[in-house]
Each structure stands twice: as C-alpha cells, then as structure tokens.
From Swiss-Prot:
GO cellular component: cytosolic large ribosomal subunit
Signal peptide stretch: none
Domain of life: Bacteria
GO molecular function: structural constituent of ribosome
Keyword Magnesium listed: no
HAMAP family: Ribosomal_bL35
Gene name tied to this protein: rpmI
Transmembrane regions: none
Protein name: Large ribosomal subunit protein bL35
Amino acid sequence: MPKLKTHRGAAKRFKVTGSGKIRRNKAFKSHILTKKSAKRKRGFRAGDLVHERDVAGVRKMLPYL
C-alpha cells in the first residue's frame, strides 16, 4: 500500500499540543484591520483549539501528526 500524503496546506496551519489536542490560529487578522477594534485584534493573536467535531477531518489530512 502506498504512503499516505500529508495535506501541505493543513500541515502549515495546525500543530499538536503536548496533550494531543490540535492548535490553530484565528482568522480575520491579516487585512482590513482599520474597522476592527484594538480589543478584537488582540483576540485574534491568541491561538485556539480545533473544535472536537472538526478534529477527525484535520487528522485525516495530517496522517502523521
């Protein structure tokens, strides 16, 4: 059986925490920032975890994670 391929876009966006959860960055922080409040932009800096319903799909894209 051939090796499974890693989804390269997903590999750049997700990392695993020490406890095995999948970490992600928040969206909406790269441009059109003038209308967003400072508080909202600070919130984008904080990382977040992938929702439990999405974990299976991410793991399928990243078989060697």
